[in-house]
C-alpha cells in the first residue's frame, strides 16, 4: 500500500513539472552551436539561457521586457544577406547563431522564448504592419492580456515595449498565430507555408 502511495505521489510530482523546467538550450544543442558558430555564439546562447532563467516565475510583463531586450541586441540584416533568400523564417538557433536577422526572425525568437517561459501562446501574435516611418512592410510581436485588451508591441525598430495606441508609426494589417491555427486544424493551408516550414525546422532544431 505504501509503495502505491509513493508511486502516486511521484506521478503527481512529475505531472506538475512544466517543460520550462528543462533548459531552453540543451547541452547537446549548445555543443552543436559551438561547432558551427564558434565560441562567441555559444556565449550568446548561454546568456540567453541565463536571461530566461532569471525571469522564470515572474510576471508576463517582466518576461516580455527581458526577452524583448535580449533579442533586440541582435543586429538587423536582410534574409538575402544572411541566407541568400528573399524571404526566410529562421529558427531562434539560426538567428542567434548568426547574430543577425530581419524582423520576422526577431518575432519568431521572442515568441518561442516567451512560450518556453510559460506565457500563454494564445496571447501572442505575429502581427503584420506597415511602418509609416520607413514606408515598408514590417512584422512585430503583439501581446494581448485579454482578447479585448489593447496589445503591447514588441518591436526591433523601437526597442521599448509600448501599447499599440502609442505606436502611431505602425499601421496594423493582420495578426497571425500558427499554434492557434494548428490547434483548430487549420495549420496546413498554403497561406501558412512559412509557418509549416518553421515548425519542421524547430522540431529538427535547425541551426
Model-derived regions: residue spans:
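Sec-dependent signal peptide recognition
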Residues: 2-9
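A structural boundary/capping signal
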Residues: 18-207
Amino acid at each position: 500500500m505504501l509503495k502505491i502511495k509513493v508511486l502516486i505521489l511521484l506521478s503527481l510530482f512529475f505531472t506538475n513539472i512544466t517543460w520550462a523546467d528543462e533548459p531552453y538550450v540543451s547541452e547537446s544543442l549548445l555543443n552543436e552551436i559551438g561547432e558551427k558558430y564558434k565560441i562567441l555564439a555559444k556565449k550568446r546562447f548561454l546568456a540567453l539561457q541565463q536571461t530566461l532563467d532569471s525571469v522564470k516565475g515572474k510576471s508576463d510583463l517582466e518576461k516580455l521586457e527581458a526577452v524583448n531586450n535580449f533579442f533586440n541586441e541582435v543586429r538587423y540584416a536582410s534574409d538575402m544577406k544572411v541566407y541568400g533568400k528573399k524571404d526566410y523564417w529562421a529558427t531562434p538557433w539560426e538567428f542567434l547563431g548568426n547574430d543577425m536577422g530581419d524582423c520576422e526572425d526577431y518575432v519568431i525568437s521572442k515568441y518561442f522564448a516567451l512560450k518556453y517561459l510559460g506565457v500563454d501562446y494564445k496571447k501572442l501574435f505575429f502581427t503584420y504592419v506597415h511602418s509609416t516611418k520607413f514606408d515598408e512592410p514590417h512584422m512585430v510581436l503583439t501581446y494581448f492580456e485579454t482578447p479585448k485588451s489593447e496589445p503591447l508591441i514588441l518591436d526591433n525598430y523601437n526597442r521599448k515595449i509600448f501599447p499599440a495606441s502609442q505606436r502611431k508609426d505602425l499601421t496594423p494589417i493582420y495578426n497571425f498565430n500558427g499554434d492557434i491555427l494548428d490547434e483548430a486544424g487549420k495549420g496546413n493551408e498554403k497561406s501558412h507555408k512559412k509557418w509549416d516550414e518553421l515548425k519542421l525546422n524547430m522540431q529538427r532544431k535547425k541551426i
